[in-house]
Design a protein with these regions (language model features):
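Asparagine-centered strand-capping/turn motif at beta-strand->loop junctions
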Residues: 152-158
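Surface-exposed acidic/polar loop and edge beta-strand patches at domain peripheries
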Residues: 1-149, 160-163, 170-320
Length: 320
């Protein structure tokens, strides 16, 4: 029972909540869109999530730009799209969608409870600014288990159908010897490429065709000077990141999730006029690619929620 605890503290100047269940520590920042800033395996002394070494932490203001100013690292939720754009359907057609969505830039309301001394349940919620919805994420930590269940609930509060994209956005440092394990056979589709020229936009994971051969994406070279955004349809609903030490971080999913988004930045890109980053993201997603208009017009993968209805999905993260 003593394994479960919640501690109030400050993380880089922000009020934060430290959630502990024995093997794991998570640090949550409600004022930054419910950001999970720290995901630590206490048994190994290993903190998994990437943190931007260049950008200062501060509260987002109106019209804040994510990649230029707030690509801070950790785990954010991207909704109702990932790329900035214009909402493509009535009655909100023409309404701007901010970069990486609306959720990261607003404070979340947090509720905490402990059930029977065995289960720590932390629910964060936010409502749409430009669109009529309620978004809810619940973290469930059981005592002495190296796993976190994450439940999502989305409510459409309008009398019109709501179209959307969603992606979890946990960022990890890309280290020499870090490996990706994605169950195959899996088909990958290129959504963006920087510093590398794919010879095919759809290919069997993990061999990306390039001029003169293939780029094996299972163990990306952090010094490759390229970046890729891919969307995959794995053979099973999970993916694993393996640390050079042999430790691993695995994410699984259930519900209407259509793709695994994969961002690999091998020192090829920064949107903030800083040196390029070395990071990657494993992103279970509803819909693809990152732009809602493109998803609806071209790719045909997007979320759809009828008037006054709700939907649920879930993730589970396990570390070893």
């Amino acid at each position: 029972m003593r394994a479960l605890r919640v501690q109030e503290l400050r993380e880089l100047g922000f009020p934060a909540l430290r959630l502990v269940n024995g093997p794991l520590t998570l640090t949550l920042i409600p004022d930054l869109g419910g950001k999970i800033a720290v995901w630590e395996d206490r048994r190994r002394g290993l903190s998994w999530l990437w943190r931007n070494p260049y950008l200062p932490w501060r509260l987002p203001q109106a019209e804040a730009r994510y990649v230029q100013e707030f690509d801070l690292g950790g785990w954010d939720e991207c909704f109702p799209a990932i790329a900035p754009g214009i909402y493509p359907a009535d009655p909100w057609v023409g309404t701007p969608i901010p970069d990486h969505g609306e959720l990261w830039s607003q404070p979340w309301k947090i509720q905490i409870r402990i059930e029977e001394g065995k289960r720590l349940i932390v629910t964060g919620a936010a409502e749409g600014r430009s669109f009529p919805y309620r978004f809810e994420r619940t973290l469930i930590l059981e005592a002495d288990r190296p796993a976190v269940r994450i439940r999502y609930r989305l409510q459409n509060t309008a009398e019109h159908t709501f179209y959307f994209l969603w992606a979890a956005h946990p960022l990890f440092p890309l280290l020499p010897g870090m490996r990706l394990l994605i169950p195959g056979p899996a088909t990958a589709r290129v959504a963006a490429a920087i510093g590398v020229a794919p010879q095919a936009m759809v290919f069997p994971w993990p061999q990306l065709p390039i001029e003169g051969g293939f780029l094996d994406l299972r163990e990306p070279d952090p010094e490759g000077k390229w970046a890729l955004k891919l969307f995959l349809r794995p053979a099973a609903s999970w993916a694993r990141l393996i640390h050079p030490t042999g430790a691993w971080w695995e994410i699984g999913w259930r519900g209407p999730i259509t793709h695994l988004g994969l961002w690999i930045n091998a020192g090829g890109w920064s949107g903030a006029n800083t040196p390029p980053y070395q990071n990657l993201a494993l992103e279970p997603a509803i819909g693809a690619p990152d732009d809602l208009g493109v998803a609806m017009r071209e790719w045909g993968f997007f979320g759809l929620l009828p008037p006054l209805q709700e939907m649920e999905w879930s993730l589970q993260v396990t570390v070893g």
